[in-house]
Amino acid sequence: MNPSEMQRKAPPRRRRHRNRAPLTHKMNKMVTSEEQMKLPSTKKAEPPTWAQLKKLTQLATKYLENTKVTQTPESMLLAALMIVSMVVSLPMPAGAAAANYTNWAYVPFPPLIRAVTWMDNPIEVYVNDSVWVPGPIDDRCPAKPEEEGMMINISIGYRYPICLGRAPGCLMPAVQNWLVEVPIVSPICRFTYHMVSGMSLRPRVNYLQDFSYQRSLKFRPKGKPCPKEIPKESKNTEVLVWEECVANSAVILQNNEFGTIIDWTPQGQFYHNCSGQTQSCPSAQVSPAVDSDLTESLDKHKHKKLQSFYPWEWGEKGISTPRPKIISPVSGPEHPELWRLTVASHHIRIWSGNQTLETRDRKPFYTVDLNSSLTLPLQSCVKPPYMLVVGNIVIKPDSQTITCENCRLLTCIDSTFNWQHRILLVRAREGVWIPVSMDRPWEASPSIHILTEVLKGVLNRSKRFIFTLIAVIMGLIAVTATAAVAGVALHSSVQSVNFVNDGQKNSTRLWNSQSSIDQKLANQINDLRQTVIWMGDRLMSLEHRFQLQCDWNTSDFCITPQIYNESEHHWDMVRRHLQGREDNLTLDISKLKEQIFEASKAHLNLVPGTEAIAGVADGLANLNPVTWVKTIGSTTIINLILILVCLFCLLLVCRCTQQLRRDSDHRERAMMTMAVLSKRKGGNVGKSKRDQIVTVSV
């Protein structure tokens, strides 16, 4: 290529170099591990709980039912997405964090206990030997031996509590005897006896004293009268048949400020039969010496001998267990289970003997001779929700408080029990009413005004809503995965139960004796009975939940729409309710329930259903640009004029852009020509006119 051709060739376009140092510096600072800046309102989110997932599923199902949409995984996901997006996108109003809303809440099965009262129904007390102690049998107690005897300090309220022991307000223990006659014919031996001695409940008033109200039909229970003769049994001392009966008169077990407790079961003891006696006969009541002799410690005496010139008779025939009940100031049911706890506190002793007739000083002489070589240890147990508090229990009637320091929580009583302590029957609380505070108003679910606020935020911050929506979708995938895993686990647990049931059926083949099978069936029946009792409490709690309208963001307990009024229910009343007190200063639960149920009914019509979904649809329709145009002009002519104006403006912008681009090209060519001319050393000298023209025209 010659120099002339090089001169004719246009020089290359020079690029405009920018200063890239600041951009490079910024790129060097960018790292993927850098944390995002947290805004002042940002809060650390906790992982979703199972209760929140369950509540989210319930709300999504409810919305689909109200809108009559088929429940498919896709529709459930979209419904859950809508709910989560509404909650996430809701702007926090100014001053909302400082607001305080206090409502009544129902907490089912809190970690609290209360004393079992005389007005409660009898509880289930299980024994390990139903031959000598009647009642349901269960030889697997205690269920958790490692938890027996845990220390506890209690201070709870009461209203006629059930307590056993040597303390005011508790039923006192004593030894009681039950006698049966063995049919043996002998000229010397009048009667042959089998007797059982064990711990029972001590009468405070002699049962032979005639009280007018004792014979009143108002307090006499309905039942079979006790026999007039001593029950006759077989010679087998290993069998004792218990039969409930009602004695001719009642005994008073307690009559003080804690109430009047009576018992209509027979209280058998030996006494002198003075009928037909011409000489001076001792009192028909039990001899103090005899009573003292028979009620001494069951461990010291293994031989009893009663001698007299008068015949010995056994009063109050019948083999029946005590069934105490309260009759004043309130009336309650019978509680036969208390005796099963008392009799298990000491082993029972089995006696065998007879009554012989001799002649001394030409007079008949009667001797009762009893011997014992057999004792049987017993065990009585309760099952949840019931427990036994054992220790130095103090009942304070002035403050209606039961206190016990360093007490033990037990479920079983056996022969190692020390009667220097007392026994208080307690159970888990079914539920309590407490005021709770929230940082927002009570809502049954994300309501219409929340949807409206969200839609306003969508219209004003569209880009922010898109990013929020993406984040919500990603979060909801994790939530859905968690729920799916939980569903699989639940399904697996059901299969495990079936597997256990199959194994349980197969395990019955390993039982080799009918007694073992009977014991297993008895245990299963007892488990079923206790389960029914426990399920009854659960059903009562569910009944309350169904009748109440609860806040949408709670599932473990129920926050009701009833506002807490401190002037009407001060905190001291709530505290006494939590302690289990039932006096005039305690919270009136029945009245409070009526108010809360009425408030729940008033909010039933405010639950957002189809109206809420319609509001969402209307709000989303506002995102259509056509609706924005319609808001400016409502006629077609005006809309057409607006469109023409927009097109004219667009055309004007395009023409201006093209003109600016042509001017820029002309300037750039002129600059290139000047650059070429300035680089020539000799200018145009020696060049022909044609070359000059060619060079310039390039």
Curated annotation (Swiss-Prot):
Retroviral envelope proteins mediate receptor recognition and membrane fusion during early infection. Endogenous envelope proteins may have kept, lost or modified their original function during evolution. This endogenous envelope protein has lost its original fusogenic properties. SU mediates receptor recognition. The record marks R464, F465 as: Cleavage. It comes from Homo sapiens (Human). GO terms for cellular component: plasma membrane. PANTHER family: ENDOGENOUS RETROVIRUS GROUP K MEMBER 113 ENV POLYPROTEIN-RELATED. GO terms for molecular function: structural molecule activity. Belongs to the beta type-B retroviral envelope protein family. HERV class-II K(HML-2) env subfamily. Residues 1-89 form the signal peptide. Pfam families: GP41, HERV-K_env_2, HERV-K_REC. This envelope protein is encoded by a human specific provirus. ERVK-9 has a type 2 genome. The HERV-K(HML-2) family contains type 1 and type 2 genomes depending on the absence or presence of 292 nucleotides at the 5'-end of the env gene resulting in Env proteins of distinct sizes. Despite their overall retroviral envelope structure HERV-K(HML-2) type 1 envelope proteins lack a predictable signal sequence. Subgenomic RNA transcripts coding for full-length envelope proteins have been detected for both type of genomes. Residues 90-631 are extracellular. Residues 465-485 are annotated as: Fusion peptide. Specific enzymatic cleavages in vivo yield the mature SU and TM proteins. Residues 653-698 are cytoplasmic. Glycans are attached at N100, N128, N153, N273, N354, N371, N460, N506, N553, N565, N584. The gene is ERVK-9. Residues 10-20 have a biased composition (Basic residues). This is Endogenous retrovirus group K member 9 Env polyprotein. Residues 1-47 are annotated as: Disordered. The surface (SU) and transmembrane (TM) proteins form a heterodimer. SU and TM are attached by noncovalent interactions or by a labile interchain disulfide bond. Keywords: Cell membrane, Cleavage on pair of basic residues, Disulfide bond, ERV, Glycoprotein, Membrane, Signal, Transmembrane, Transmembrane helix, Transposable element, Viral envelope protein, Virion. The chain crosses the membrane at residues 632-652. InterPro entries: GP41-like, HERV-K_env, Retroviral_env_glycoprotein.
